[in-house]
């Protein structure tokens, strides 16, 4: 309908030990409860027919998983917004200066609306505070670094390869993702970033850092997961350690098979107690809605 590239390619979730094998069964049950069909638990002989280079004790096959070009999704949504009527606009590179219940002042003019919906991502908490919303949470940025498989190594991955999530940690773990266009990404890690939009390892912003480190939830997260966090930082600066993590599922992968890729920032919503808020938090404040 919208001519956006996508592919339902399927995914395997790989258990590498007995403990993960038990969680894999629970994962399958959760998927079936949520309406997924065709889920299968596969032994090594079976899952190697799908991903010959993967090693593990068991895998969950998720045939309905797929990939899509998210940039094209965003562009198509923008087109649809613009086509609603002559007053519909998509305005980019625009800073919010101030606002009240019906008026929002920005770097590109003042706009009036009966309702304002804020989806500010990394800055959603600051926008909410500007709107006099009292929060018991804060956004803390975590950078995820990726590597990519070289052209010669792409044949090692056919579809999507994921680890079994560890419920003790608020991060998924490194995985192999085939992208629309042919690239295969490996990662990410998860490291605290000293700038909310800090896509580089050396990025720093004093305001962002002070706000994050003066928040009780940040320190409680650090204390609860200090060992995990330390290992993530080591991997951020060591290609060989990053590779070692990938080799847990694909031992045949070599250091020359991976090259540095892109980075992304996760806008992690943390409660005052240091617990990660896993779902969207939607707050209504008079006529405004904050996500």
Predicted regions: what is each one?
Residues 39, 87-89, 288-289:
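Short, conserved active-site loop motifs that form the nucleotide-linked donor/cofactor pocket
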Residues 14-23, 60-79, 231-241:
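Short beta-strand to alpha-helix junction loop
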Residues 213, 219-291:
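C-terminal catalytic lobe of FAD-dependent flavoproteins
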Residues 60-115, 119-126:
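Helical element adjacent to the flavin cofactor pocket in flavoenzyme catalytic cores
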Residues 99, 106-205:
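Flavin-dependent oxidoreductases
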Residues 6-9, 91, 136-140, 253-264:
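A short coil-to-beta-strand element that immediately follows conserved catalytic motifs
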Residues 1-50, 56, 174, 195:
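Dinucleotide-binding Rossmann-like beta1-alpha1 core, especially the glycine-rich loop
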Residues 1-6, 193-228:
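Glycine-rich active-site loop/strand segments that organize a redox cofactor
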């Amino acid at each position: 309908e919208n001519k956006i590239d996508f592919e339902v390619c399927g995914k395997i979730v790989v258990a590498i030990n007995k403990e993960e094998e038990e969680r894999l069964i629970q994962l399958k049950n959760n998927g079936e409860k949520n309406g997924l069909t065709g889920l299968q638990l596969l032994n090594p002989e079976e899952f190697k027919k799908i991903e010959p280079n993967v090693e593990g004790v068991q895998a969950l096959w998720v045939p309905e998983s797929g990939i899509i070009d998210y940039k094209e999704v965003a562009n198509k949504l923008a087109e649809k917004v613009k086509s609603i009527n002559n007053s519909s606009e998509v305005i980019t590179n625009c800073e919010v200066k101030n606002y009240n219940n019906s008026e929002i002042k920005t770097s590109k003019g003042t706009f009036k609306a009966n309702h304002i919906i804020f989806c500010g991502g990394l800055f959603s908490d600051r926008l909410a505070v500007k709107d006099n919303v009292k929060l018991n949470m804060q956004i803390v940025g975590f950078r995820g670094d990726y590597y990519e498989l070289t052209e010669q190594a792409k044949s090692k991955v056919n579809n999507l390869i994921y680890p079994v999530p560890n419920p003790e940690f608020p991060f998924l773990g490194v995985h192999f993702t085939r992208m629309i266009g042919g690239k295969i990404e490996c990662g990410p890690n998860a490291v605290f970033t000293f700038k909310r939009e800090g896509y580089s390892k050396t990025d720093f912003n004093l305001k962002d850092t002070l706000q994050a480190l003066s928040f009780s939830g940040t320190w409680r997260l650090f204390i609860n997961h200090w060992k995990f966090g330390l290992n993530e930082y080591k991997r951020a600066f060591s290609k060989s350690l990053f590779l070692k993590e990938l080799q847990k599922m694909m031992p045949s992968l070599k250091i020359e098979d991976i090259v540095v890729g892109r980075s992304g920032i996760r806008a992690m919503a943390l409660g005052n107690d240091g617990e990660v808020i896993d779902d969207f938090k939607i707050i209504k404040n008079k006529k405004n809605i904050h996500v």
